[in-house]
Amino acid sequence: MQPTVTLALLALIFGLTASAHHSAAAFDRSKPYEMTGTVHSFLWANPHAWISVDVPDGKGGSDTYELEGPGLNGMARSGLTGHTLRPGDKIKVVVAPYRDGSKRGEFMAIFKDGQQLKF
C-alpha cells in the first residue's frame, strides 16, 4: 500500500507543477489593449515565442515591452515561422498585460502590414 500512496502523491505534485507552468494567472486577460511599435527582436524558441517591441513613449523616446506568445507548435501549424517577424517590422499587437504593471504581457493578436497573423 505504501508504494501506491507515494506514487499517487508524486503524480499529484508533478501534475500541479506542469499546470502552474501553463497558468495564465500572471496576465490580466480582462484588460487587453493595443500597442503599435517596432519589433526589436523576435525569439522563436520552445516553449513560447517572445517579441520585444519598442513603443513610442510620447516624449521622443521609446519603451521596450517584452511579450510572450503561445506555443510554437500552434503558431507553426498556422504557417508562422521564426522569420515571420524581423527587427524593424512595424506591428500592432493586442496585449494582455502582466498584473504587476511591468512592461510585459502576452500577445493575443498581431497585425503586420494591415493583416492579422493567425495563430
Where do the model's predicted regions map?
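Bacterial N-terminal signal peptides
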Residues: 4-17
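Short nucleic-acid-contacting surface segments enriched for D/E, G, S/T with interspersed K/R
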Residues: 77-92
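Short aromatic-glycine-enriched beta-strand elements
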Residues: 45-56
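Short boundary/loop segments of OB/S1/cold-shock single-stranded nucleic-acid-binding domains
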Residues: 18-33
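OB-fold/S1-family single-stranded nucleic acid-binding modules
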Residues: 98-119
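A short macromolecule-binding patch
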Residues: 58-70
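Short, structured beta-strand/loop micro-motifs enriched in basic residues and often containing a Trp
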Residues: 69-77
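Conserved hydrophobic positions within beta-strands
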Residues: 35-39
